[in-house]
Amino acid sequence: MDFVPRLNSVLTLVLSGLWHFGLTATNCDNCDDPLASFLSLRAFSSSSDVTGSSSPAHLNWRMGTGGWSPAYSNAQQWLQIDLGNRVEITAVATQGRYGSSDWVTSYRLMFSDTGHNWQEYKQEDNIWTFVGNMNADSVVHHKLLHSVRARFVRFVPLKWNPDGKIGMRMEVYGCSYRSDVADFDGHSSLLYRFNQKTMSTLKDMISLKFKSMQGDGVLLHGEGQRGDYITLELQNGRLALYLNLDGGQARLSSIAPSAILGSLLDDQQWHSVLLERVGKQTNFTVDTNTEHFQIKAETDALDIDYELSFGGIPIPSKPGTFLKKSFHGCIENLYYNGVNIIDLAKRRKHQIYSGNVTFSCSEPQIVPITFVNSRSSYLLLPGTPRIDGLSVSFQFRTWNEDGLLLSTELSESSGTLLLILEGGTLRLLIKKVAGHGTEIITGSGLNDGLWHFVSINARRNRVTLTLDNDAASLPPDISWLQIYSGNSYYFGGCPDNLTDSQCLNPIKAFQGCMRLIFIDNQPKDLISVQQGSLGNFSDLHIDLCSIKDRCLPNYCEHGGHCVQTWTTFYCNCSNTGYTGATCHDSIYEQSCEVYRHRGNNTSGFFFVDSDGSGPLEPLQLYCNITEDKIWMTIQHNITELTQVQGSNAEKPYSMTLNYGGSMDQLVALIDGSEYCEQEVTYHCRRSRLLNTPDGAPFTWWIGRSNEKHHYWGGSVPGIQKCGCGLEQSCLDIGHFCNCDADTDEWANDTGFLSFKDHLPVTQIIITDTNRSNSEAAWRIGPLRCYGDRHFWNAVSFSTEASYLHFPTSHVEFSIDISFFFKTTALSGVFIENLGIKDFLRLELSSPSEVTFAIDVGNGPTELLVQSPSPLNDNQWHYIQAERNLKETSLQVDNFPRIMRETTEKGHFQLQLNSQMFVGGTSSRQKGFLGCIRSLHLNGQNIDLEERGMVTSGVRPGCPGHCSSYGNNCHNGGKCVEKHNSYSCDCTKSPYEGPFCQKEISALFDSTTSITYMFQEPYPVSKNTSTSSSAIYTDTVLSKETILLSFVTAQAPTLLLYLNFSTPSFLALLLSRNGSLQILYHLSKGESHMFTVSTENLANRRVHHVKMNRDGTELSIQMDQQLFSYNFPLEAEFLTVRSLILGKVTETLGLDPRVARANSLGFIGCLSSVQYNHIAPLKAALRHASIAPATVQGSLREFSCGSMVDSDVNAVTTVYSSSDPFGKTDDHDPLTNAVLSDSAVIGGVIAVVTFITFCVIGIMTRFLYQHKQSHCTSQKKEKEYSENLDSSFRHDIDLQSTTSKCKREYFI
């Protein structure tokens, strides 16, 4: 490839580009000359004039009528000026009519090159309304935000002095405008031939303006023989860019465009295009919309052979023919890399070869009309009545699915003809007076905003409906059909004062544009309609198509699909993971911790959206919510132990890990966590890992920033060591990794990487497995993190003058703010951010009111949420405020969301330039006193604590979380304050888990017995209260509480048994019929039996029992039923000595009623057992080594709540001889038999226990001796891939015997 042409093209691009843009800037700086002051009277025209002829309307004009005033003051009036040539307009000014009370208070501007097909001036993508005058003499000047180029300017009054009439004097400011224009008729093109065979460019800049008469056509094309190409092509009114830098790809006809921008580009208005390319980086701009993208290619150069064509792609072998549809319209100021192509063509330079191209823009005089109102817009045009047949044709475009296009009453009682757009489909209906009717249905999706041609032709009994050159007809055998044309044709809708027979509209009026209306093959002059000399109309814009694409740009965020009508747009957020009017709000939480805080207590896979409404997509990961620390786990694509052989420095082994998300997503999750880790394992045999600290490493890993890291698990960044190197416990003291000992036996280095700035591991490289007998295996565990740094990020404001400030909020279209607050103050400002005119403010305006005020330049919008209870109660409350293009909303806690629709007129971009104040205002007044936590702006966390550390009057953190969240600790759990959160202490609860909600339950069989001895409390918690020891004294208990849940199919059976200080006891049992009975045997020998429920509770269902005794009053809750009993006043209740669950093994002296229920033990499931502050079942299962609880028989932990019949049956099938789930014997069990069986079982247990102790003693001595003569090492349980051979797995398992007594510790 020749370097010189490429260098020359780059220099030409840079120098000519600088000259071109410098010249443009110079012209713009001086473009403020008055353009209308010296124009003659003929330059002015108007809709009407009070004098009957045109009046001068120059600024400061005092002669004659002193300016322009129309004959009628209504919304149809306008004042127009012809500037003679296309000029650049930068400003306008107005006055009222001199010496009168006539002036305009607001108006719109329209522009045109031809005096037809007007374009309304827009600002911020809205039709702009200018503020007019307040009197007749003062001048109101407006600098246009962006200049326009036009010959004709039209002022359209909207409002005027209510005590006067419309009156106006005006001036237009700007400068002359020069341009080079080429006109293409759809069958012509310009060819720009290169001086050399191939033009190879590293940079390209192409700029042009175009005005198109149709929606399709090629603007530019060039290609090279090796496959490079560049094409700009109009497709359905949008501009597509095709750009390829690599040869060999598919051709233009079979590939998708690199980018596609714009909409409604066939509106016969000027549109600008700018294409900038530097290597693979490309900026593509159409009007005000820009798309940046990177070309997927190996090279940076664009190689074009021979020529570039503009306006079409001619076929060299067939003159006058083109490869694709050619462009029909005008192109202006066409520059290719600084070369003015049209100027070369006008001067007939040898590089340019032109077809039938002219150098002035010829435009057809097409007059469009706009139907504005869906209720009252219509156009009435006359026809020629009583003609045998009918012919009507026109073009229309709209976004609405439904609307009336045409209604006409036919002559000679031949019925009514209707043309309706319904559901985007065209329906032609002919209704006869006699009740006959027929229809034609054609087309679909006609509400796509494109121009569609419709033609109706009827002759005798034949009717043809043509849509976009596709004809559909009625069946020819309709004998009753005879059509005679009527004298009135209603387009778009019907007037209110007509009868149904004159104009029928079974659907709403049409909103959209029409043009080229023909009736009886004659065109209709719509300018005559505007002047009142033809037909009639209502709510029309004539000589203007004001269609607007509300989905460009697409304000639906996060991939939401934009759907529009004529007046508004909607966002379809299906399958995006987001919700809201513009798909702004994520439906997922920002961390696993927030999920649990919102009440989700089940571990599993969740989608986590770390930046909320920000640009990052949600990522699916696993949340372990049931533990105290909430771990999130992100797995990658390689989970098994992977064997490596045959790698060296010249041919390294490399493996890349894929976590199922982007690096930005992973980094956001890691940075938002308190702690993260990844376990890395390297098994080796004659395969070195890191070498010596001074030597080049043999293995390394790549982290988040694509950097090499030369430390291993258990070590820290900056030192080339493994974990054993830090602990000085490696196999060879001369190395800092076990594998660096380079032995013939298997060794391993395993540990955790926990430096967050380096995580996650994205790649591993191994280079030392190519020597004799050298091999290795590696495993990298999942990324695991816990803790949410954002959710508990809080500050406290101690003075009203204190505040935090942050950089201004650079948001324009959508903004959402969310945070928690708590306070005792009466009022205070949470957040304030100001602009020149715009602002936003969130404040506590009263103890029970929150106000959100925002102004984008159209006047403030204020939302107020009133709480039924005070918000200054020192509890945490949540606020979410949002403003987007569709609505403004405010929500406090779970109160109803307050919403107000956003106006689509005027400003819609929020422009702020001051710092964002949190907790106060710039004036240091109305500051907030209290705490603000978890502040997010558009999903991004605002680090309050970091700024609070260095700000006077503000301190990081906020104590007192238990006051708001203490009720999250259930079942007797106690809320414990932490610095930046809280936790639940479940010591005195029969439950466990983060919120004391996880039941502790177990399966019992007939031999199971748990005996809990009430002595001094066991030390399961350092926070055990001294008051809890009260139940261990010998004093009489005045109160007691018993809780338990059970599942069984056995009756009778004993649920719980309490031994008191004397032979007194308390028993909870099921009688033979399954009813619950409570038996009290008190100190003086009296017994009290309470039958709580006659229902059979031995029904394999979970039942809950809660018993409270306060003195002599006893209340029992059985499931949802509540029972009350009373003891005699002299009843005495002593201290409990022991509590037994399951079978009572000491049966001597047992009450016969208890013995009967105890005979077969308890078979079933018990859960959540509690006596006062003691949880005996929990103590036996969780603290067996220190709790005074003894377990005999089989005890298996199990969830009663998930128990099914098969689980219950599995426990009971062993005892078939006396199956309690079978038919119940009517007779009582034989007490002697029970006692005999118990004695036998007791003897067997004693023998087995003695033998067990003997075996344990012998094994203990043997192991002790073995330990003295052999070194042992701990080995972690391993998982191996099925594809590893058995010898390899066996060798790894033998590592513990070759460790030479070295032990490796990991952080």
Swiss-Prot record:
Protein topology in the membrane: Single-pass type I membrane protein
Stretches assigned to the Fibrinogen C-terminal domain: 585-792
One of the Pfam families matching this protein, by short name: Laminin_G_2
Glycan attachment residues as annotated in the record: N283, N497, N600, N624, N637
Domain F5/8 type C, chain residue ranges per copy: 31-175
One GO term (biological process): cell adhesion
Extracellular side: 25-1238
Main subcellular location of this protein, as a coarse class: membrane
Keywords annotated in UniProt: Cell adhesion, Disulfide bond, EGF-like domain, Glycoprotein, Membrane, Repeat, Signal, Transmembrane, Transmembrane helix
One GO cellular component, as annotated: basement membrane
Disulfide bonds: C31-C175, C330-C361, C513-C545, C551-C562, C556-C571, C573-C583, C931-C958, C962-C975, C969-C984, C986-C996, C1165-C1200
Purpose of the protein: May play a role in the correct development and proper functioning of the peripheral and central nervous system and be involved in cell adhesion and intercellular communication.
Family: Belongs to the neurexin family.
Name the record gives this protein: Contactin-associated protein like 5-3
Organism: Rattus norvegicus
Gene symbol of the encoding locus: Cntnap5c
